[in-house]
Amino acid sequence: MARRQQPWATRTARDRTDAPARTQLLDAAESVFARRGYGLATIADITAEAELSRASFYVYFASKEEIFRVLAVRVRDAFLAAQEVPGVDLDDAAAVAEASTAAFISAYARHLPLLRLLEQQAQTDDDVRQLWEEIQERPVHRAARYIRRLSADGRLAPVADPLSVARAVGGMSIQFARLVAQRPTEYDAAVRDVTAMYLHLLGTGAAPCEPTGPRST
């Protein structure tokens, strides 16, 4: 008698990638890793957090190591998406700076516990190291290309090399995101202030932002 194939075994890679249960497991894994750390986290912890069976986990992931790497890819993509700024005129440097800064700070603050783990795991895992480097570098280089393009068109007069400006803005955004992770009420002020400094470095001549939100003391 032919062996009956389980329904899940016939799913395509696309089906598994798009499945709500997969997203549920990823969200649960991020929470568990943030709470317990990488070493102590188990697949049982993740499935319990997701309220799914252990068998469901193996439909989508082969191991704890794999789901951690998939999370790293998701975080990398979140930072790249932060620079997409849909609905914003890409020739409007001030609007792009504000929208991309807001999205970056939000994403970094939201994923901060996982980012700390990624940095640790990057010391011993080559795959995670590559993803960590992409998280650090790809948004910076994309921003630098944008600055170069507008500079070549005469729309910007950056105070330094575009790559240096992009690195400076990235560093400021990370520091403010860490503050926001501790004090979410500082989000609006963080976006306002980083945007103002970003525009100064771009040489846009934009007027300083007026204080409208809470400030740290």
Residue map of PLM features:
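Hydrophobic alpha-helical connector segments
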Residues: 70, 84-113, 162-169, 191
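Helix-turn-helix
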Residues: 20, 24, 28, 32-66, ...
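Short amphipathic alpha-helical elements of helix-turn-helix/winged-helix folds
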Residues: 28-32, 107, 142, 172
